[in-house]
């Protein structure tokens, strides 16, 4: 199946994210949407950087402290260094990573993600989060990841685009069901307990990008049935922060997340 055509006249969440992180893979529609969203929610760029740093800490922790060597990153977005495979292969060069996204521009830049350590492996899969069977059944995944061994699944800054809670739970359940015990799920999503985050979600919706802010209870429920590790579900900058990095004020962080294990 051919990938969807790239429409540069309509803003896309991945390209807005790229622009607000200082990237260059975006278009006028994305920049205009980003300006309107930041006007409504001025701390959004700070929060996005904090979320990216959270991904880095989570990936490093799972590789270094839990020995996970297989990673499935769904909703990859545009390349932003350090990418997940770069983080985990610094810990374990033999680590294997599969990236999943369905944005045409990400497809164009996939080669930038596929520079792997010689001992490891990195693959890219064009698929939609909502179609879990197409992800888990893909030849690219089967050639890279052994589902009989633990896998760390990364759903970072993507679940806010799944508006229905039942659908979000179904997606997570379908992903985790075939995974081996010892597998992990890392999530982050927009919190409803921050006025700036809620304003940002409203601004995204005004630009045609359906977005949901979740309560702490709703975020915690996404990890139901799993063994949550410390510090639990928290604002992303407070998840095992780097001791040598100044901690941002809670008021500027829009994302809440956590990491849990399948036992």
Predicted region positions:
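Conserved beta-strand signature within the Rossmann-like core of class I S-adenosyl-L-methionine
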Residues: 151-155, 171, 179-190
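Rossmann-like AdoMet
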Residues: 1-127, 131-144, 254
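Short "lid" loop at the C-terminus of a central beta-strand within the Rossmann-like core
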Residues: 158-161, 190-194
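Short alpha-helix
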Residues: 210-234
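A short SAM/SAH-binding and catalytic strip from SAM-dependent methyltransferases
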Residues: 129-130, 139-169
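Short, glycine-/aromatic-enriched active-site segment of Class I SAM-dependent methyltransferases
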Residues: 192-208
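Core SAM-dependent methyltransferase catalytic element
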Residues: 232, 238-263
């Amino acid at each position: 199946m051919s990938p969807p055509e790239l429409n540069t006249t309509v803003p896309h969440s991945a390209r807005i994210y790229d622009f607000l992180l200082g990237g260059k893979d975006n278009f006028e529609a994305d920049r205009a949407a980003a300006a309107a969203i930041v006007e409504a929610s001025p701390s959004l760029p700070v929060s996005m950087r904090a979320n990216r740093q959270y991904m880095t800490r989570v990936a490093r922790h799972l590789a270094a402290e839990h020995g996970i060597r297989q990673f499935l990153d769904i909703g990859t977005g545009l390349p932003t260094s350090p990418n997940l495979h770069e983080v985990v292969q610094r810990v374990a060069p033999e680590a294997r990573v599969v990236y999943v996204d369905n944005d045409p521009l990400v497809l164009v830049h996939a080669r930038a993600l596929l520079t792997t350590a010689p001992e490891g492996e990195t693959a890219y899969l064009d698929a939609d989060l909502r179609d879990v069977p197409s992800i888990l059944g893909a030849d690219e995944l089967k050639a890279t990841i052994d589902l009989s061994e633990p896998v760390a699944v990364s759903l970072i800054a993507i679940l806010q685009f799944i508006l229905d809670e039942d659908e979000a739970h179904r997606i997570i359940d379908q992903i985790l069901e075939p995974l081996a015990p010892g597998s992990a799920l890392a999530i982050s999503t927009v919190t409803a307990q921050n006025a700036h985050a809620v304003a940002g979600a409203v601004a995204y919706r005004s630009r045609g990008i359906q977005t949901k802010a979740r309560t702490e209870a709703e975020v915690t429920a996404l990890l139901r049935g799993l063994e949550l590790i410390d510090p639990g579900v928290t604002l992303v900058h407070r998840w095992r922060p780097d001791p040598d990095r100044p901690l941002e004020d809670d008021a500027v962080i829009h994302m809440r997340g956590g990491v849990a294990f399948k036992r």
